[in-house]
């Protein structure tokens, strides 16, 4: 039996709400390793970003290495949800200030999105 088969199918939501850049690097590494362990065909991953975590998407505009990691994860169908409440409260124009965030990535509430995904069977991970 392959290592990937032993884990079965998984649905996971990663929660990011800190502006600590090392946390983002670690979280991206965790997600990459998670996909590698389970197999891309066996996993659905969403990353919900709200509060101070949104500041990390500003950092990405300046860090090509992290940009490539985000791009790689998106190419593996990892979905990113960015909190509209946070964008409004911090007066952030996601089209200008955040790396690779599109209208479809915006969720009304990060916390409500986390709860919804857990109700849909996603396991919660807070790196």
Task: Please report, for each region that a protein language model flagged, where it lies by residue.
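Secreted/extracellular ectodomain signature
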Residues: 1-127
């Amino acid at each position: 039996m392959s290592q990937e088969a032993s884990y079965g199918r998984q649905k996971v939501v990663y929660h990011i709400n800190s502006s600590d850049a090392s946390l983002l690097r670690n979280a991206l590494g965790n997600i990459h390793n998670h996909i590698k362990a389970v197999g891309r065909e066996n996993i659905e991953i969403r990353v919900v970003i709200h509060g101070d975590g949104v500041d990390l998407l500003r950092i990405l505009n300046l860090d090509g290495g992290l940009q490539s990691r985000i791009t790689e994860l998106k190419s593996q169908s990892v979905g990113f949800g960015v909190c509209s409440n946070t964008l409004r409260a911090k007066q952030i124009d996601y089209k200008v200030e955040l790396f690779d965030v599109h209208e479809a990535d915006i969720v009304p509430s990060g916390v409500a999105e986390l709860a919804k995904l857990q109700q849909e069977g996603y396991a919660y991970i807070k790196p």
